[in-house]
Amino acid sequence: MIKKIKNIINKIINFFSTIYILCKIYLYYNIKNRYEAYNILSVYGDDDFFNKPCPEDSSNWKDKLTFKWVERIIFVGFFRAPLNLNDISDLPSSLKVENTAPLLKDIIFNDSTIPLIKHIYSKFLPRNYIATGLFVFVSVFSFITPLILKNFLSYVEKIDEQKHIYIGIIQCFLLFLSSFINMASQQYSYWFGFKTSLEVKGALETIIFEKMTKLSNLSKKNYNIGSMLNLMSVDTDFFQYFFCHYYIEIFLFPIQILSLLGFLIYVIGIAGFVGFLVMLITIPLSSFLGTQISKNLSTSMGYADTRISLTGELINGIKFLKQYAWEKMFCERIEEQRKLQLKYLYIRIIYWVLVQIVTQASSGLVLVSTFTTYTLLGYEVSLEIAFTSITILQNLRRPIESLPDCLHKFISLIASAKRIETFLQSSELQNQPFIHNQSGLNDILIRNINFNWNEHNLKLKNNKNNQNNNQNKRSIILSSGEQFEITNDFTFDGIDIQDDNYDYEKEYKINYNNNEEEENFMTDCLLKIKPLIKDRRLQQQQADYQDLLSINLPPPPSENVDFKAPKGLLTIISGGVRSGKTSLASGLLGEICKAVDKSSPDSVNSILSTIQQPFLQSTSFRENILFGKPMNMERYIKVIEACCLAPDLLAMGEGKDLTEIGERGINLSNGLKHRIQLARALYADSDCYILDEILSSVDPEIANYIFQHCIKGMMKGKTVILVTHQIQFISSADHVVVVDNGVLIQGTYLELLRMGIDFEMILKEKENRIEKQIVQLQEDEDYYEEVEILDFTMNNNNNNNNNNNNNNSNFNGNNKLKRSSISLPKGISIESIISKDFDQTTIEKAKLFVQEDRNKGDPGWIIYKKYIRMGSSISFFIFTCIIYLTSQIILLLSDYWLQSWASHDRLNVSEPTDVHYLLIYLAYIGGFVFTLGVRYLLIAKITFGSAETLHRSLLKSIIRAPLTFFEQNPVGRILNRFGKDISDIDILLLDCFSDVLYCGACLVTSIGIIIYISPYIAIPFVILIAINYIFQLFYNYSVLELKRIQSISRSPVYSLLSEVYNGLTTIRSFGQQERFFNMMKDNININLRVFFYNFAVSRWIGIRVEFLSAIVVLMSALFSIFNDNPGLSALGVTTALGITFNLNWFMRQFGELESRINSVERVQSYISIPKEKETNEDEFIQTGFIWPSRGEIEFKNVEIRYRPNSIATLRNFSMKINAQERIGIIGRSGSGKSTIGMSLFRMIECSSGSILIDGDDISQIDLKRLRSSIGIVPQDPFIFSGSIRLNLDPFDQFTDNEIWEALSKVKLKKMVSTMPMKLESLVQGGDGLTIGNKQLLCLCRAILRNSKIVLFDEATNSIDFQTTRLIKQTIEENFKDCTILTIAHNIDTILDSDKIAIIDEGELIEFDTPLNLIKDSTSRFSKLIKLNNNQKNKLN
């Protein structure tokens, strides 16, 4: 017996080898010659099919039945691989999201209470009645094959004299037809079900994105980018998978099971009822296990949300993590969430194994219980009874095995539906910005308006205000700061404000110019602020800056706001830290909730804004300015000039204004980011502009230029609301609003001076500080001569007036200076640095982002080998395959034993009894169940281990990637690996691998038994296998490329989602929601298009394989007619019918496996990306325990390029910094200042030259040691989600007392101590903290780190003067023994440095003490001080 089986296996191997060789010869010679002869490629491959309609729409019924309409893609994929997107025709119009999304919009717009799943069924089921009819037809037709088989087996059992050969042949063809029609119908039902699933998926993704663009700020806080990505990927994929496979079957499976069991009872009698009872027991058990699977999966998805959110935060803050050397900390946080996720995924796998055991064993248990009962009742098991029952059970196999999976998928679907429903019911932002209307004729006037970040609190406040309407008490609050209550008990300068005869307006000489409306408005404002206005000069002298910085989290609401911005004039909003400036601007934009108390505002018809955190798209410089507007070259050039962008364009090289900008402007300086967003607003030509801190991030020269040429120039005649803490510009404003501790005080500049707000004193204090620093420098140098210093003081108005005309000129006399900060070199026009047309050469030079990697060709065994080795070993996998094969052999032997039982001669007393046969049969079933459990545990171990290893390796690879990797790859693309790809690896690969091994084992054993029964059937088998192999070759070349394109086509969806999420405020203020919505619809349609053709190609081969399988059934039946052993004949035909199902399922799941293994391929490609340069063990400099001990820094001929072929950012840069020196580094935006800091941290490696710290070349220092030894306060403070403690001391290196002491030094102790959980209080990405607070927290980190070298990278640009003074005071007190590098563009920030370094175009043009530079009238530094003097006095 064993020898015969070995011979059969050898024959099968020889057959496959022969087939493979013959097919290769045939395909690569005959077919390719034919291809060349008929020029197939000229027919299919030369044209661009991207915009051509779907060929299915114009195909005839025969092409639709055979899926011939998709052959063009198959042939092009085989003959001219790889495929690209232009080879793929359009999506059918019925599947486009423009036609499907409106079906679900009721859920958003009408506050539908209908559950999402029910709503989808009601909308999409009637559209796809063909799919419903096909599913019903397949269920009904599943009874036909067992009936035909029953008659065929009755024919086989007859003696030869009673047989009529033509009857047998007719029944053979009936088996062929019933098998083919049944399985072909399933293919068509899959196809139409798949179309439904695409409609649902596209519609859901569209409405989720549309809803996201409408989210209020509170809702946005509840849904971070990780949650949004999960909604758009994992949750919508659950819907797609369910509606593709189960949305009709969930109703039909129970009916099908009951009907087939009823048919089994009809065939076998009352014994079938016992089998029915066994089935009833297994179904609830499977359902319970399925529920547990879904429960654990849902829990794991919650941890996956957190993991992806943390990963997104890691990618967004990768620069800061590397500078702080905190990668390990963040990796541990992500790994912690990953472990929790894997814990529940592991529990899910245990339940999954139990489900597989129950469902796979149930058919055998039903058969055992049925035959046992049948035997005990005294009946004989005949061939007709036995194999008809087996066929019924084979038909029962899919509904029985699929029903539990279907139920637990439905439970998972409910969980996803609830997540989506909750999101869709989230509160939305009010429809329009606060100051929109159609007239635009009047001032912006707001009276008695309540603002709040929280809608619920706003309603409570409104109700409370209504209840207390008659009380003489008012509350005025703006976002943060204390709540000031105005009562009748206050007095103002000794005057009782209840005195109606007190003429406040006369006292402060306020003139309303006979404007009754303005008089009423100002009177109301003055009544509110009377009790709060003090002598501001006294306040400035006695101010406690610690109190100014104290805040409570979350920020309190804003109530009873009165605000005015005159039409066509400049309004400046100013105030201290957390005074409410940005909240007021957000309220005007409609970004926070509002309720009108008494009156509505007059409005303008268009409004644009710039925000403190600039939003830049990952597209070209030009597109970021145009922002969807058509190109107007004349205006475009004016905008470039007004925003001082021409020198930056020149520095971009050959790419000019088509140069790509990294996501979030990662490759740009902070000042350039702000100027680009200012240019965007200016180009759009609005009626009203709200500009939030745009002048703080640029140097004084550029700030003055922008103020004069942009704000007072091109924006002249527009309503401009400028939010700034730079009070030197206030005197130029037409209307001033001071926000002080939640109170709005407003009027003209002179009116506010009369009220006691002394701007001049604050400005003079700042100017005097510069003057005192200069005088101190003189004293330190014992230099008392009269020098030109007096010309630089802020009181010398004569020189100021003479120099006002020189603000925009080059600094003559300094031959080191390359060019002015604001103008182009002579001979270069602005037109020459703007690309005239989109020529391919310029575009290629302008590219920053790299095209997403896409492997080509068949990944073959290599990718599977890598995947398996990550979870176990190749030998372990081979052992698993053997167990799969063994279990199927045992099952097949049980069927063989059953035919022996049915065929034995019961009249012969020497033959074994029925009990003997029954016991052996039970032993076979027991062995099958045991090996079943073992095989599933083994494959689960491999896939689970691989998933764990892949994520860990991916995370380590990303964290070690150089900064250029993140500049060249959008966040969405990277998160796609951590989201969709890892999710597929975690969940779907287990099912796919298991099903492929199971079906493969079934096919091998089935083919083996058929050849064993009828050896001559091997001859036609060779032909059929050869034809099948040819189909497979054509299929594989195309489907692999389609799957890769499909994976890549998802990245733009996620990238755009991430981009829009981060830029919602800007997008909404520009009214660009529709444009981005259309972009997302295009991206979704492209992804669905590739998905559509991918599935169509699978159906093309599926229908052909089904036909070949039906021929196998026909041949097996024909050979059985002439077989002398009826039992073996019955076994052969039954096995052939099983091949039909198994081959169909194998093709389906193998295609699914190939698709999912692409996720492994994509993750693997990121694991192998280049890493940051590691120091070799031999080259590593073994530093002492304390390093650096002195803090000496030396740059030696350093040259740095961000990319190999780019312009050098630093050139021939040499500079030596002694220990404990304070170095001030200044230069225009983009001059290379920040690159110096980046090079110190080895964020960018030197192209040439070297950097030494304490005499050690930092390129030979371990990266972690280097970065952890240098302190930094960055220009864009980044606060990670987590506690205050985590943001200050992530490695628990310091005690609570040390942390509190550091907080006290930066004057944040009071703020943190008032938080509910003190150091453990959560700050989600810095929400509720001002820029100043964030900078102080970063300063606190530097104090705790106690490094010998500290870098301050433009750390005070975006904060007010008081906070800047606090930071400088803290630096002086806590970093006395440190080497300090201060990068800045404000002179007063670095004037007290020991030396000043001036950088221009990447070169060091001046480096000396401040005094020496000041004494040199030709130096750049002395001219900068003069310029600073001129600008401020001109404004005054």
Swiss-Prot record:
Protein's membrane topology: Multi-pass membrane protein
Record flagged with keyword ATP-binding: yes
Positions of ATP binding: 575-582, 1227-1234
Keywords: ATP-binding, Membrane, Nucleotide-binding, Repeat, Transmembrane, Transmembrane helix, Transport
Pfam families, alphabetized: ABC_membrane (PF00664), ABC_tran (PF00005)
Gene Ontology CC entries for this record: membrane
ABC transporter domain boundaries: 543-766, 1193-1426
Domain of life: Eukaryota
Gene Ontology terms: biological process: sorocarp development; transmembrane transport
Domain ABC transmembrane type-1: from-to ranges: 128-412, 865-1155
Transmembrane segments: 8-28, 129-149, 165-185, 238-258, 261-281, 349-369, 373-393, 873-893, 919-939, 985-1005, 1017-1039, 1101-1121, 1127-1147
MF terms in GO: ABC-type transporter activity; ATP binding; ATP hydrolysis activity; ATPase-coupled transmembrane transporter activity
Subcellular location: Membrane
PANTHER family listed in its UniProt record: ABC TRANSPORTER C FAMILY MEMBER 1-RELATED, ATP-BINDING CASSETTE SUB-FAMILY C
Family, per entry: Belongs to the ABC transporter superfamily. ABCC family. Conjugate transporter (TC 3.A.1.208) subfamily.
Name this protein carries in UniProt: ABC transporter C family member 15
Natural source organism: Dictyostelium discoideum
